[in-house]
């Protein structure tokens, strides 16, 4: 899937309208993967910038990942069984700064089937 990230407004877990096309492309790709292998596992990773407390950023990153998962299930029929979420807060900044930076406010996706598969 050739999408770097879905970016968010400051302090928000709502997926902006300008990012919705990415969600649709992600859903299409996930559904194709899952059609080929019903055991696919995809990890949705939430991130924040470094503004605010670590605890607030952790909660926000988890909410961002959960929002994408909900949208994929509700609007695009991606099976929830194949999706997992994690929030990293401000731990993995793309742009190392203590200031607000839109590139750090994101969710990323990772196919982890091969990592967790017992085969």
Model segments located where?
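Periplasmic OmpA-like peptidoglycan-binding domain that tethers envelope proteins to the cell wall
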Residues: 45-119
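Periplasmic peptidoglycan-binding/anchoring modules of Gram-negative envelope and division proteins
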Residues: 8, 12-45, 69-74, 109, ...
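A short glycine/proline-enriched turn/edge-strand or helix-cap micro-motif
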Residues: 1-9
